Amino acid sequence: MFDTLLDPLIDASHKGFPHASAALRLSQIGAQGWNVLRGDLPLPLAVIRQDRLQHNLAWMQQFAQSRGLGLAPHGKTSMSPQLFRRQLDAGAWGM
């Protein structure tokens, strides 16, 4: 079941998904070649750069650990099981 949360089926009922496109797994979206600046995606939407996300995850975990703290991010803020998993994998003790 958790794999389904990490790679859900996304369709036009999801904010930011093109209305004319067929449903896709989350893992398939990057291969579509969609471009925000070309207007391929409806607005509003968020763009998350993997390199910056990875940097922020590592930085926050190191910041907490260097102060003897455990990190338990507030999951409701992002509402994203994929981000929950990344935070837990980076060392957060809970969500």
Mark where each language-model region is.
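A charged N-terminal "starter" segment
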Residues: 1-95
